[in-house]
Amino acid sequence: MKCRIVAPEVVDWERLDRFEDRTVFQTREWLQFVSETQDASPVVAEIREGNEIVGYFSGLTFTRFGVKVLGSSFPGWTTPYMGFNLIPGATRSVALAALEEMAWEELNCLHMEVSDPHFAVEDGQALGFTTSAYVSYRTDLRKSEAEIFDGMDSACRRCVRKAEKSGVVIEEAHDPAFADEYYEQLKDVFAKQDLVPTYDLDRVKSLVKHMEPTGRILLVRARDGEGNCIASGIFPGYNKIAEFWGNASFRSSQILRPNELIHWYVMRYWKQRGVEVYDWGGEGTYKEKYGCVPHSVPWFTKSRYQFVSKLRDEAKKMFERKQKFMGWLQTTRNASTRG
């Protein structure tokens, strides 16, 4: 197989969107969202076997500290996976080898990372990639609504019923004010742990701007009996997979259990639109009460030179330290204000 870069102006997005293994994270609008928020350039490449096009690759390139990187996806992008779209019978490990050659020789990258929901761990190991994983949970939406609800533990089902009896209602959002409301609630969630959100308000606004018009994202609010917005959530989806991207609520209203009702609404929404999998957006044992099962997607990384991989690991540690410091600083400021 060979990878050939496709010029942005001639990409046939409708053709790409017809692939059975296509996810929302490979769509044109999602790439535009990542490009805008990460100062990155979208890359779409044909995968050819002889004269036949057997698939496509989607990702982005960016440069940090003089190092050019190919990401599909990359840590910090709030995008769990991208990868390939291939016709039945095409082999992902062979496509990955072709992509690596393109990354080094044509794109002149020094580092690359690829995560694909259809990868097997062996696909990367055989080519010398360092292997980690995007670890999450999944709910099978092919089950009936009754089976999904009965699969939750009894306490979770009681929370859903309590929210309904307390007058909590879920509404779909389509207005610009949604991003601000969601982010205020998100800050409250992180403040509980003396942290600050890992992304800023502008990222949420960019996501809503690019994705809301497509119909491939569900934005929801939970309102209490008095009409106050007490919780919200962001749930992109396309083809077979929907994703829990973000959910936030005010601590003062969590006794009404709006979050459980939101997830129950979201699973039914995407199920009714033919989606087969609800991905719970990463780790968190609290998610197990919904009856979901653990699932991991291989994440492959490789650097052309060893020093680059060390830079990547150190950058990740620096980001984690920054988050803890910013959370401490915010807590200190709040305490000073109250005093």
Model-derived segments and spans:
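Active-site/acyl-donor-binding loops of N-acyltransferases
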Residues: 57, 61, 123-147, 273-339
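Short catalytic-loop micro-motif centered on adjacent basic/acidic residues
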Residues: 113, 171, 276-279
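A general structural motif
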Residues: 42, 107-111, 275
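Conserved acyl-donor/pantetheine-binding loop and adjacent beta-alpha core of acyl/acetyltransferases
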Residues: 60-81, 310
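A conserved beta-strand-loop-helix scaffold within acyl/acetyltransferase catalytic domains
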Residues: 1-50, 54-67, 116-255
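A gly/proline- and charged-residue-enriched helix-loop-helix capping module
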Residues: 75-117
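Aromatic (often tryptophan-rich) hydrophobic motifs at membrane interfaces
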Residues: 46-48, 56-57, 79, 91-101, ...
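Alpha-helix C-terminal capping segments
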Residues: 5-6, 11-20, 98-106, 270, ...
